[in-house]
UniProtKB/Swiss-Prot annotation:
GO cellular component, as recorded: chromosome, telomeric region; cytoplasm; nucleus; Smc5-Smc6 complex
Subcellular localization: Nucleus; Cytoplasm
Name of this protein: DNA repair protein KRE29
Keyword Repressor recorded: no
Function: Acts in a DNA repair pathway for removal of UV-induced DNA damage that is distinct from classical nucleotide excision repair and in repair of ionizing radiation damage. Functions in homologous recombination repair of DNA double strand breaks and in recovery of stalled replication forks.
């Protein structure tokens, strides 16, 4: 069998097929050049040539001899010497892997399995852009984390935060409501800036819906709230059998027995600042209708007073106040049954005089009670405008100095629009309030009420 001259300084000769058939060579002679054919895919061929012969690194005999025992040797070839093989043939038969395809899925399937789960890494020279301290810092953090995890805990006690306590109390209060998402508990308990989720809740339990619906189905005569006065002063028999007194009716509404007996907000227990326990309530207009059955002009003062306080506690409840079916026109019909002064006096027996949050809610229901409420609040029977304005400024300074900005916000909302502090740019009290709020807003404060007060006072000063 003939051999091929492998000297790099001589031209290569064309070798006939008969001379290389013993090698089972994949070389195919053509008129254009030699091609390498993959045995696994007859349709894919690759040119057999060196793109840059001058810069090729495999030119020395030492490099060629190092490849003799590698997988690059021709199968079936039994060389007697290093010159029996063409070095070009050794370098071209490098792999049995199929040629890459345009189809990515096909390429992944044809890739050897041992390479699929590996990502090729390359070294980049970032120069001055690479920060050597990053690797040392990461290593220190990993060592510190390992040390913390491996070290024994010195104190097994768990730190209990105020948010943890509030979340636990909220979970207990709403346990009857079924499964509550954890995200709801976090949103409600972590909102501590404005306390918008805390309010007065007269109804704190689920209503007795079936019993109330039974009363509703039996009720054919509407109370005077709905245009008929024939039921006024007389409790229907079917209602009296189920609810002998107003207290029994309130229990059906979902009011606990303690609140039914007191009909007063206990500020020591912070009943005016409780989370909503997501209890179900009966439709507001129907509750008012059933409550009206227990009013009578012939009743003694204690019974009428109990009725009025129950009514005030009910309409101030956040769930009742914000109910979609709540109609304040029904509340006006109840107010007509009492003198305004008597109504305001009963109101202040339930609500603290400094709770301007509920004062503002009451005025949203009964706007025309603003002057009567302010006179009663500042103990001015004669209601002189100059004296009440001085008391209002004094009250403002107290809230402002104590940084009680939430109450200060509702204090402003309660006062404005009355004849004591009217709207418009000519009110000197408004200018004083604006200067005080502007001074505190220039300081570093995170109280959201300050920003709201700035906008409100600017708005009130522009109303003519």
């Amino acid at each position: 069998m003939g051999s091929v001259n492998s000297s790099p300084n001589e031209e290569f000769e064309t070798v006939p097929d008969s001379q290389i058939s013993g090698f089972d060579s994949p070389l195919i002679p053509t008129s254009v050049g030699s091609y390498f054919r993959d045995d696994d895919d007859d349709e894919k061929v690759h040119p057999n040539f060196i793109s840059d012969p001058e810069n090729d690194s495999l030119n020395s005999d030492e490099e060629f001899s190092s490849l003799e025992n590698s997988d690059l040797n021709l199968s079936g070839a039994k060389a007697e010497s290093g010159d029996d093989f063409d070095p070009i043939l050794k370098r071209t038969i490098i792999s049995k892997r199929k040629a890459p395809s345009n189809n990515e899925d096909e390429e992944i399937v044809k890739t050897p399995r041992k390479l699929v789960n590996y990502v090729p890494l390359k070294i980049f020279n970032l120069g001055d852009s690479f920060d050597d301290t990053i690797t040392t810092t990461v290593a220190k953090l990993q060592d510190l984390k390992k040390e913390i995890l491996d070290s024994p805990r010195s104190n097994k006690s768990i730190v209990i935060t105020s948010n943890t306590v509030a979340k636990s109390e909220l979970q207990k209060s709403i346990k009857f409501s079924g499964s509550i998402p954890e995200i709801y508990l976090d949103v409600v308990t972590k909102e501590t800036i404005s306390d918008k989720y805390k309010d007065w809740h007269f109804i704190s339990k689920n209503c007795h819906y079936e019993q109330l619906m039974d009363l509703e189905m039996k009720d054919t005569a509407y109370s005077f709230l709905f245009g008929s006065s024939r039921s006024q002063g007389k409790v229907p028999e079917f209602v009296h059998l189920k609810c002998p007194s107003i207290t029994n009716l309130l229990v059906l509404f979902g009011v606990n027995q303690e609140k039914c007996n007191s009909l007063k907000i206990n500020y020591e227990k912070k009943e005016n600042s409780r989370y909503d326990n997501l209890c179900t309530i009966f439709p507001v207009n129907k509750m008012l209708k059933f409550l009206m059955y227990f009013y009578s002009d012939d009743d003694n003062d204690d019974v009428r007073e109990f009725f009025l306080k129950a009514f005030i506690c009910l309409i101030l409840d956040r769930k009742v106040f914000n109910a979609m079916e709540s109609d304040h026109r029904l509340c006006f019909k109840v107010l007509e049954l009492f003198n305004e002064a008597h109504f305001i006096n009963s109101y202040f027996e339930i609500v603290d005089k400094n709770d301007f949050f509920l004062h503002y809610r009451l005025l949203q229901i009964f706007p025309h009670l603003q002057s009567a409420l302010l006179r009663r609040r500042f103990s001015e029977k004669q209601g002189r405008t100059e004296t009440i304005q001085q008391n209002i400024i004094k009250e403002f300074n107290e809230f402002f100095d104590c940084k009680n900005y939430k109450n200060l916000l509702y204090f402003i909302l309660t006062m404005y629009g009355s004849k004591f502090i009217p709207f418009g740019p000519k009110c000197q009290v408004t200018e004083y309030f604006k200067d005080c709020i502007l001074d505190i807003s220039n300081e570093t404060t995170n109280d959201v009420e300050i920003s709201i007060l700035k906008g409100i006072l600017n708005l009130f000063s522009k109303i003519r």
